[in-house]
């Protein structure tokens, strides 16, 4: 209450920031009179002037008003588009490394040109991150005209692009690309054998488009580069045949072999299920007689069985994946796009392939991985823009340290968001949806229908076809046409059905997309300039008539066929209507059979329907119901936030280790004078460690095992050092002197190798051996960390803190890996006999991984730990240092719900 009162008196922080930016906007507007009279050449020369001022010590903030005014003028001349004042505010928000929430259709793409130009002046590079190649290419070509007009270079990074082109794109002042490609290029740069093969520069400044989709929705799935591992794919087929013979439990207490927990996406075998599974596996010869699934030799069978159960019980065709060209292709659950080349990990993808009876590919070995959270936090400055960020402002602040600023709209929003209608069954719901679509079509109002899956998309399409209602279908199977379909979705009588609208990146303009049609006329070589001008004029007039007609009909009507588990995704769908003050409307149709309601709220809403004696086909429409659904969404959002936070806490451990390894790699690649000193230090450390095993520090001669030391030096490093003879010849030879003499002998032996082949070749060979050893041990270490992480949540049952145990054991594994690398390098270099330079090149060849695959892995350990915590099995928590002010129980919840903390996220504490 007090905070609301203070906000009413002094305004919110967001209001204060907008006022602060508005003062700078006035300065920029005043500069327009100075900049407008400049010729094109004079305007272009401003770029050189700004660069000179930066080199003289002037800060970017000091240049901002003038630079923004220059970009605005260039945009007017090149694109015929002038930045609104609210876009100038958004540009300042991005420049300061914050997130700008700007409603759909308000011009985020144009807004971004302001901070992009300003920050590109430093010469360190600016990365613009989009959700797909189409948008990266489109924006680079479209907005690139402004930058090129002002004398800056523009590059675009696309998947499957030649290496030289990619290096050139990253070398440009401004680079467009997808989040996946930036992340994979970073990982690939840390797998190269020569520094010249790297493509990326220093990570300076990134602006992330659809920042909520990339930094939140995809934060649970790390980027992974993997290679094929050895293994028998036939086992998946043999296990798949058995899965239908196992029965699913209807509930916890009913008979059956396994249960499915949809909330945690887990499949668990019951005791009877284990016995039945053992019997079935024995029948097909996979489990030897008199042995158990619990035997160490049969652990892989449990892995195969669990993957098969998950494939059958949790993953559905045309919802989670599609089958194309004898392959299982994953469907992105957030955007509805196909993700060819991506594969689920832990054998799940192979299990789905066996289920669908397509060719089974071998399992993968992880070569390198990173989460988007840790990749984007490496940028010196990070900013983002989206139409829906405010509901996730707390997470952006907690995880990335990014403040969210809501940018005022250029015109007031005129869209009418109607209350949800809830039906008992999906059949009744779809009947109501068809009736609403039919009503809109008959009066000419355009409709956009958002569905949650390809399956529902095609079901609705079939129903509309039966009703003889013409419509367009947009889903992951036709993403090549998606921009054209969406661009024309605002025309009269247009009915468009689309899967999840996140990241589509194309505005829906009432009356159809005028600019798209005009651009086609402009690039038509068959027309002369006069004809083009006339045709463009006619097109504008015809569009204006269509535009006014659609506005009279009420604008674009949005229909949601189900609520997503995130309110933000629902808001993205709604936000497609009512752009720049246009009229519009939206409504969600729900049923008690929808996943969200079935899992979280069906009993409560069903009781309301029963009390009201609702007849079949009648919908319930009440603020209480809408509030109950939003509460269910908040529960899921809070749970997903906890999962992402836990995943980050685990990945931070691996990230610290990754930084050390990658830094060592880069130092090796960049060492111009060779790495002889490093190799010498490693050799001394390894030999001293070996000596210590046989001649302990500060020990007397009677405790020494000299024969053992001589044997170890000979077998490990092929060194024949007469230690016993030295001791017999010199009675004054003590431990320290002996160590020095052994090391001197070792170094002399190694120096002989160097002289034999030449210092240059030996330096090259040392570098290759070090890189190969680091890479191979790092791959093994990643697998060990993965294995450790999968079972670490079970430590909670032993009254241990899983996170603390993971950190401790991961550190021990890492220390062991570093020792193994040193020993490996020393042994190879001491024992190898180099006869030609070709041998050096062969090492470089073998150290380069082949047949790489790029994908997101389905990490589930954070969810498993979360489950064990909620079931009351968490160990006693360790003390921690709070990084921010404690939130009072009666304070407003930081998630933005408007409720007290104790009644919202505080319930989770």
UniProtKB/Swiss-Prot annotation:
Zn(2+) binds at residues 893, 895, 904-905. GO terms for cellular component: cell envelope Sec protein transport complex; cytosol; plasma membrane. Residues 899-909 have a biased composition (Basic residues). One of its GO terms (biological process) is protein transport by the Sec complex. It is found in: Cell inner membrane; Cytoplasm. Its EC number is 7.4.2.8. Residues 567-586, 859-909 are annotated as: Disordered. One of its GO terms (molecular function) is metal ion binding. It is an enzyme of class 7 (translocase). It is a peripheral membrane protein. It catalyses: ATP + H2O + cellular proteinSide 1 = ADP + phosphate + cellular proteinSide 2. Its main location: membrane. CDD domains: DEXDc_SecA (cd17928), SF2_C_secA (cd18803). Its cofactor is Zn(2+). Residues 865-889 have a biased composition (Basic and acidic residues). Pfam families: P-loop_SecA, SEC-C, SecA_DEAD, SecA_PP_bind, SecA_SW. Keywords: ATP-binding, Cell inner membrane, Cell membrane, Cytoplasm, Membrane, Metal-binding, Nucleotide-binding, Protein transport, Translocase, Translocation, Transport, Zinc. May bind 1 zinc ion per subunit. Part of the Sec protein translocase complex. Interacts with the SecYEG preprotein conducting channel. Has a central role in coupling the hydrolysis of ATP to the transfer of proteins into and across the cell membrane, serving both as a receptor for the preprotein-SecB complex and as an ATP-driven molecular motor driving the stepwise translocation of polypeptide chains across the membrane. PANTHER family: CHLOROPLAST PROTEIN-TRANSPORTING ATPASE, SECA INNER MEMBRANE COMPONENT OF SEC PROTEIN SECRETION SYSTEM. NCBIfam families: PRK12904.1, secA. Monomer and homodimer. Part of the essential Sec protein translocation apparatus which comprises SecA, SecYEG and auxiliary proteins SecDF-YajC and YidC. Belongs to the SecA family. This is Protein translocase subunit SecA. It comes from Nitrosomonas eutropha (strain DSM 101675 / C91 / Nm57). The lineage of its organism: Bacteria, Pseudomonadati, Pseudomonadota, Betaproteobacteria, Nitrosomonadales. The gene is secA.
